Amino acid sequence: MNKKGFLDSSSTKILQDLAVAPIDLTAPGVISKERIERFSLSVEGFTLSYATERVDEGILSALEDLASERGLIESMQAMQNGEVVNYIENFPSESRPALHTATRAWVKESPLQGNAEDISLRSKIEAQRLKDFLNRYRDVFTTIVQIGIGGSELGPKALHWALKGCCPSDKKVYFVSNVDPDNAAEVLQEIDCAKTLVVTVSKSGTTLETAVNEELLADHFLKQGLHFQDHFIAVTCEGSPMDDTSKYLEVFHIWDSIGGRYSSTSMVGGVVLGFAYGFDVFLQLLEGAASMDLAALEPRMSENLPLLSAMLGIWNRNFLRYPTSAVVPYATGLEYFPAHLQQCGMESNGKSVAQTGEVIGFATSPILWGEVGTNSQHSFFQCLHQGSDIVPIEFIGFQENQRGKDIVIAGSSSSQKLFANMVAQSIALAKGRENTNPNKNFRGNRPSSLLVSERLTPYTMGALLAFYEHKIVFQGFCWGINSFDQEGVTLGKDLANQVLQVMQGQEKEGALLEAEALLRLFNNIKK
């Protein structure tokens, strides 16, 4: 498809005009029963209410036209089919597919082709190997430690935290990610090494932080008289330095076409979640994600949950020009989910070069951040209600808690109080509250949406994970950027190695000599 650029699309120009005077949420009668019913969508057990977004039918129609002009559904279909979407034209780039959806497509037996079919079949084989491994070793160990950084930690950790409230387990789970040795030392203080399985996750098999932490843990195990091969397994790409069954108890595979931040439904998340909660729980997670993958192919924006949410985000970012966006889950189980979304969104779409290789002249990823409610109401919500910047908020909530333990006080349960707080915040941000005292005046017109499901389960967590993955990817397609590389991460690794050369007194070509003065300054700090 020969698509116009984002700024050249006719719908973009229409939306720019509409953004001059968008709907006023504070006007009497705007947040009506009819609007709430009309501006909602239910898909795969989730209901999205966007009545408190600054949109009307005209804006929604123009957003749908923009999605069509930019070929978003065609691009999503191409990605799921295994076409090359990770590329920059006319410049060296990774030039490969993005096949995270194939890691779970096999559970639905979805018809695939080419690269997607290959990765789906391989993922099914790896899942069966994991099931066999768990049958042999899950009862041998009481604890698992996952070593990995970025997508090898943030996604699996968020999923583990989400499942622990609904899936009984007698296993202990820890993550070591930071190269700061205190991270590993803290975990080592907590575990019985003789009963611990360690899974090292690195696609390349050479990730600096991961290699250092593996060596640190291996040394500790050795000093306790334990053999590396009896306790350490690996998740890595075929042919990497870690792909060595003579060294590890077992090696599970992932592939270059699956980006770290999108890898939680591969063995990157499968091993630790399968060990903690059992293979069937991991399978339920995959089923939820695979269902949302199919839902993301619905051609109508009004019926496509991730596409609708993506375009609402485009409206807020590019036309209302809000620079940040908050995700606030009203569920303790999603405590680490905003951190995962922060990486997934900002590493994917924090770009200023189009796939054509041209520098772009419009905003891309907002700054993503968040925290669970109601805790967040007592930390940063003051700024959201009365601060000088408007921050769109995505609320996530559930009608039931996970653990089933609750109490009724003053006529309502704790779960009801939690849900009431979430709904109240959305309405308060939209409508505001007038007061003659300017310090108590709330101007309102602060947009938000609510995404609600019945209960946080493995299935709904899988669907929620995939929902946000697709939302982020849809936005990248709309902007015409590459959502699947991360050159900024690569730069940081390269420069750190150059600084280390200076610290070690190595005058090699490429050493970052500019760091010498800084290092000298800090070395003079008195102890």
Swiss-Prot record:
NCBIfam families: PRK14095.1. GO terms for biological process: gluconeogenesis; glucose 6-phosphate metabolic process; glycolytic process. One of its GO terms (molecular function) is monosaccharide binding. Keywords: Cytoplasm, Gluconeogenesis, Glycolysis, Isomerase. The keyword GTP-binding does not apply. Its EC number is 5.3.1.9. This is Glucose-6-phosphate isomerase. Catalyzes the reversible isomerization of glucose-6-phosphate to fructose-6-phosphate. The lineage of its organism: Bacteria, Pseudomonadati, Chlamydiota, Chlamydiia, Chlamydiales. Belongs to the GPI family. PANTHER family: GLUCOSE-6-PHOSPHATE ISOMERASE.
